[in-house]
Amino acid sequence: MNTSEQGSSSMSRVAIVTGAARGIGAATALQFASEGAAVAVLDLDESDCAGIVGRIRAAGGTAIALGCDVADEAQVDAAVDKVAAELGGVDVLVNNAGVTRDNLLHKMSAGDWDLVMNVHLRGAFLCSRAVQRHMVPKRYGKIINTSSVSALGNRGQANYATAKAGIQGLTRTLAMELGPFNINVNAVAPGFIATEMTDATAARIGLSAADMQAKAAEITPLRRVGQPEDIARVVAFLAGDAASFVTGQTLYVDGGRRL
C-alpha cells in the first residue's frame, strides 16, 4: 500500500490501537473502523477487547482482538507480526496503552515508578520499533502517541508526568528518524477526559466522578471536560493524509486548559 492508494481518512488501512479495550483507545478503534480501517484491538487481556471488536464487526467492520503486554518485547513483536499476517500489513499505530499509580514522591514506590515507565515509555518504544519493520519497506506509516497535559508537570504524578513528557521526546526523535521513509510520527496530549481512569482518580481522592468533572470544567476555558471521542477524532486526523505534512508535533487537546 503506497501513498497514492490512501485517501484523506484511515479508510482501507490496517490500524493497531493499544490500550483499546476502553476509554480513549476504544473510542479510537471505533473511529478508525467507522472510516473503513481494519482494526487490531490490543489490550493486556484479550477478553477485555471482545466488546469493542464485537461492536466493530456488528457494524460491518473488520477487527481482531489481541492480548498483549506492551512492555514485553516478545509479546509485542508476536502481536504485530500476527496483525500483519491476518490483516495484510500495518499502516497505523496508536500507542495508547497506559496506567496510573499516583502518589507524592516520598510515598511512591520504585515498583509504581517502574510500572508506569514500562507501560508508557517502554511500551511505545517496543510497539513503534515493531511496526516500523513493516512500514519502512513500503515507505508509508503513521504513528500516533498518547501524551498528556500532565507532561507539563502535575502534583502527585512524578512517574506519569515524566513518562508523558518522555513520550513527546520519543515522538520528535522518531519523526526525525522515520520521516525519510514517509512515516509520520505525532502525539496528542489530552486534557481532562471522562474515562474509567479519571473516575478511578476521583474515587482515590474521595470525590465522585461528577464532582471531579465539574471542578475540571471550571478551570477549562471551554467549560467542559473532554470525551474519548474528542481525542479519537484528532487521532484519526493525524492518521489521515490530510495531515501528511505534519510530523514531530504534540497536539494539546485540552479545551484550552494549557493556556
Feature annotation, model-predicted:
Residues 125-128, 140, 222-253, 258:
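C-terminal substrate-recognition "lid" of short-chain dehydrogenase/reductases
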Residues 128, 163, 171:
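Active-site helix of classical SDR
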Residues 133, 176-180, 244:
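Alpha-helical segment proximal to the catalytic Tyr-Lys
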Residues 104-105, 112-114, 143, 212, ...:
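Substrate-binding pocket helix/loop in short-chain dehydrogenase/reductase
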Residues 108, 154-162, 173:
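Active-site loop-to-helix junction immediately N-terminal to the catalytic Tyr of the SDR YXXXK motif
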Residues 190-200, 204:
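Short, flexible catalytic-loop segment of classical short-chain dehydrogenase/reductase
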Residues 46-47, 67-78, 110, 230:
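The beta1-alpha1 cofactor-binding region of Rossmann-like NAD(H)/NADP(H)-dependent oxidoreductases
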